[in-house]
Curated annotation (Swiss-Prot):
Main subcellular location of this protein, as a coarse class: plastid
Function: Found at the monomer-monomer interface of the photosystem II (PS II) dimer, plays a role in assembly and dimerization of PSII. PSII is a light-driven water plastoquinone oxidoreductase, using light energy to abstract electrons from H(2)O, generating a proton gradient subsequently used for ATP formation.
Localization in the cell: Plastid, Chloroplast thylakoid membrane
Organism annotation: Chaetosphaeridium globosum
One Pfam family linked to the record: PsbT
UniProt name for this protein: Photosystem II reaction center protein T
One GO term describing the cellular component: chloroplast thylakoid membrane
Similarity comment text for this entry: Belongs to the PsbT family.
Subunit relationships: PSII is composed of 1 copy each of membrane proteins PsbA, PsbB, PsbC, PsbD, PsbE, PsbF, PsbH, PsbI, PsbJ, PsbK, PsbL, PsbM, PsbT, PsbY, PsbZ, Psb30/Ycf12, at least 3 peripheral proteins of the oxygen-evolving complex and a large number of cofactors. It forms dimeric complexes.
Keywords: Chloroplast, Membrane, Photosynthesis, Photosystem II, Plastid, Thylakoid, Transmembrane, Transmembrane helix
Amino acid sequence: MEALVYTFLLVGTLGIIFFAIFFREPPRVPVKDKK
């Protein structure tokens, strides 16, 4: 059970960090708008 808990915590932490960076610095690759 410890492996499951550690995996969940790791994924949660990585997700929070990823979303924090993503929302703080919006992606600069507007491919769809560029025609």
